């Protein structure tokens, strides 16, 4: 990891904090901007102009290199890396022997037998250190900056910032460009569901690149994005289930096969395992941890499970069986406004009535509470509520948010396929066991919930193309 503190973008003088009104203590010495203009304004920018975010600067980054790099990745991931080209990437998934997701993230190819992974650590480091293959792993966390530009104006902003044409960059590909002679990697990828890009480069060059992008972005009406507006308000309406947001990971519940010893490894490296260490479980699912773990099929990623690839890989036997049953899928759930109001009204019925848990929060990501609980040695809070068809449990609801662009309360549901038809009337049980519980009617809605053209389907030929005569002054 980066050892030079002067190269950190988290220094008090960093332009990262310019305009921030609240900060979030993510880790010792690392404060993330929590809000700039507020969640309503920041999240909505992706649907009209764009937002510029830096939340993923804290990403676990891990390089895999060596003659057997492809074989190693194929043995631990559901994906097939044997034909990955020099400009390509994979949305990689690691599973345990039950077929449950252990982590997922992006893998890009940097060179022959050299791959960079995002969010696959710590499982990937544990597996590599216990592998007999000719590979080596290097933790690259905090050595590169990670800037996201998401929204309808994102391509125009990026082209004007680097003064070059990026219209040829296809979805899920990357290439190198420069700003004022500084090399950076641009990836066409994002979490809002619509047109979006990522920019990566040496951490020492963050200030110059970030200031340039923000300066150009301001002219296009872009907004800086804080942590509060990042997770739920983008991933849930964008139709992207996300680790550590919509579901926990079974890092301490997978002591079989190649994962035997992982719990001890994480106990020795608690800073790597804190997302799933001493979890606090809320919502009507209660302490039923197994119900919260998901498979690739539960979250709609069956296309990323390559059962036909040569060789064995972690979870293949279970995933083969799950593919045959393929019982659950992911949907958007639209919450009934009157029922939500009824739950909220319990807060106002006097001291003789025990109120339900608050439902007026903008999103079910407990940043403030997590900061306090982690300082006390407790774990991250995960909420999941039970979904019913009539009185029959059919799955869970997670990632509840108020979407201010559509003026709706929505969540993602991992539910039985037989009840996943758009328009189906279901209900969610609101309330952690031991607190008052109420049914809230929900309706299955399209996934993703938003109406934007998805990034992978977006034809950018209608986006104004940068040319030297269009240079901003």
Regions found by a protein language model. Name each.
Residues 75-133:
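Well-ordered mid-protein domain cores that form the structural environment of catalytic cofactors
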Residues 1-95, 100, 330:
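Acidic, proline/glycine-enriched N-terminal capping motif
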Residues 1-34, 40, 110-473:
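Conserved, structured C-terminal
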